[in-house]
Amino acid sequence: MKITEQRQGAVIVLKPDGALVDQDCALFRGRMVEAMGASLGRFVIDLSAVPFVDSRGLETLVELTEELGKSGQALRLCAANKTIREVLELTELTSLFEHFEDANTAVRSFL
């Protein structure tokens, strides 16, 4: 999995490219932890290049969101495809994640 990082003001946008599945979760988590150490605690995960997320991927997103929330930081999701949005609904996780149509809208939500 390739993960690109872009800073937009005080917000870090991470864009994974590929499915967020078990074998890539450690890489994704490591990249997030690295970014957490060098940020103001505002993150957007751009899911536009993620075709699907398995249970381990969901677990990783939940854990990161909860960790960030405990320290007053925040994570937003954007550009999830229909399949990912349906998985979030079926697992009743839509209330945990703020989701936006695109990265710019998600970044502006922090203002």
Question: Residues of each region from the PLM?
Answer:
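General small-molecule cofactor/ligand-binding pocket signal
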Residues: 4-6, 78, 100
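Residues that form or immediately flank small-molecule/cofactor binding pockets and catalytic motifs
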Residues: 8-10, 82, 104
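Amphipathic alpha-helical interaction surfaces in cytosolic regulatory modules
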Residues: 20-97
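A charged, well-structured terminal subsegment
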Residues: 98-111
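Short low-complexity stretches enriched in small and charged residues
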Residues: 1-4, 32-33, 107
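Short beta-strand/loop segment at the start of cytosolic alpha/beta domains
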Residues: 1-15
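Active-site donor-binding loop signature of nucleotide-sugar glycosyltransferases
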Residues: 16-18, 102
